[in-house]
Amino acid sequence: MKIKDYAVDTARAVAFLSRIPMPQSLFKGYDGRLGRLVRAFPFAGIVIGFIPALALLLLLGLRADPLMAALIALSIQVLVTGALHEDGLADTADGIGGGKSREQSLLIMKDSRIGTYGAIALILSLAIRAAALAVIARHSSPLTAALAIPAVAALSRGAIAWHWQRLAPAKADGVAASTGQPDEAAMQFALASAGLVAALLIWPAFGLRPLVASLLATGIAGFAFTAFIRRKLAGHTGDTLGATQQICEIATLCALATAL
């Protein structure tokens, strides 16, 4: 693997997963397929998590209340991603919660309007993540707490690669189907790099037990949700990819906070 090619893949992945602008020259001749691109999702997560992590560091350094700092950091993260993953979580919650059959669930998920299940899922997602991040901030230095954001961002986006590769598209005409199925090698590289990033960021800052807890939480949450979606929808959609990221981020932050 060439470093230049991986750097280009990372930049394209950042553009796909966020609203961070990237040079148009990187997309010249690019067909939009994501089969290989998922290998760069964890490192794209680091880039995406940098700005909210910096905000958390500055706020905690100014002795802001940890919960307030966590909420502001997560709000900035939503702005950076354009609420891409939150939208997927809400649509998936509406579809699974309101649909009585696979077909009805998929139809509901196409509706751009948010329902009761989606609203509740969004509220709980933000509340639980903010609470967990606040716990981490209260028991850590500002720099250590800030490192949790890119670490969890990398792990949760590695989980997207797993979910995407392990399930066939639920809809032949869906957006996820049009971008292609991730390569097995790309998925494995994404998982390995996500674990490496977590080890480099979490172990020195928090210790071995929080690292193990974070890895287990991401793995269990990603595996369980993928199995659940396989049973409910018999395949992935763009929305379930976003929901995977959110669920794994929630689980990992909670595990990290509990293991301190």
Swiss-Prot record:
The chain crosses the membrane at residues 40-60, 64-84, 117-137, 142-162, 188-208, 209-229. HAMAP family: CobS. GO terms for biological process: cobalamin biosynthetic process. Keywords: Cell inner membrane, Cell membrane, Cobalamin biosynthesis, Magnesium, Membrane, Transferase, Transmembrane, Transmembrane helix. It is an enzyme of class 2 (transferase). It is found in: Cell inner membrane. InterPro entries: CobS. It is a multi-pass membrane protein. The gene is cobS. This is Adenosylcobinamide-GDP ribazoletransferase. The keyword Nucleotide-binding does not apply. One of its GO terms (molecular function) is adenosylcobinamide-GDP ribazoletransferase activity. Joins adenosylcobinamide-GDP and alpha-ribazole to generate adenosylcobalamin (Ado-cobalamin). Also synthesizes adenosylcobalamin 5'-phosphate from adenosylcobinamide-GDP and alpha-ribazole 5'-phosphate. It catalyses: alpha-ribazole + adenosylcob(III)inamide-GDP = adenosylcob(III)alamin + GMP + H(+); alpha-ribazole 5'-phosphate + adenosylcob(III)inamide-GDP = adenosylcob(III)alamin 5'-phosphate + GMP + H(+). Its cofactor is Mg(2+).
